[in-house]
From Swiss-Prot:
Name the UniProt record assigns to this protein: Ranatuerin-4
Job description of the protein: Antibacterial activity against Gram-positive bacterium S.aureus (MIC=55 uM). Shows no detectable hemolytic activity towards human erythrocytes.
Tissue note: Expressed by the skin glands.
A single BP term in Gene Ontology: defense response to bacterium
Protein family per UniProt: Belongs to the frog skin active peptide (FSAP) family. Ranatuerin subfamily.
Subcellular location field: Secreted
Keyword tags: Amphibian defense peptide, Antibiotic, Antimicrobial, Disulfide bond, Secreted
Cysteines paired by S-S bonds: C18-C24
Entry-linked InterPro entries: Antimicrobial_frog_1
Gene Ontology CC terms: extracellular region
Pfam families hit by this protein: Antimicrobial_1
Coiled-coil annotated spans: none
Length: 24
């Protein structure tokens, strides 16, 4: 369960940061 969340966060957070800061 926890590795799944870590893997999901690793995918989601960069795209959130990308869309917020416009730095991809």
């Amino acid at each position: 369960f926890l590795p799944f969340i870590a893997r999901l966060a690793a995918k989601v957070f960069p795209s959130i940061i990308c869309s917020v800061t416009k730095k991809c």
